[in-house]
């Protein structure tokens, strides 16, 4: 992208439009896009069309793009479980927060197996921290994870089902559970149809058969999806597999 920016600057007198390059900060925590939008990145000059580039090295040389959604809606999951500490020699006096955590993890796996959808989705717990000593019933346990879906309706359905199951586990285990699952997730990136058509045309001219319109959806996501609310956009993936 830096090379492309250099070329555009060098030959800007040949370009019939203004070209603005955006290098996004804070990508991993999902905050970068809003920072840029608040700073007026889509104005001065006003942005009418938006291209987003991504590079991967696990597919043959070429270009891939989707029609419609190309990434997933992504929400964070934070679960705090409060039990009651007790020595394991008198465990009946305690309330085991790790046991409740285990049931929540099992519920997430069950939801992944039983929820029916034509779109990819996942409910995943990636972090667990609980207990203070090996001989003490764990009073506090914290779970962190992610909820991802390529369909916003599925996202909301999965969120409600998971919250309902966690509430049942709270009653069953006599714990107190606080749950935060983003009600408004980072949205999926939705490619503009006219931009897809243009991308395919240019891709055919440059890449030929190595320009691919793909249908497989991935559960990756990016807060750059918010840019697509301000201008017609296209998310392009350039592939450059290194063989050997």
Which residues are covered by each model-predicted region?
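Histidine/acidic-residue-rich, glycine-tolerant segments that coordinate divalent metal ions
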Residues: 2-4, 8-127, 131-138, 222-224
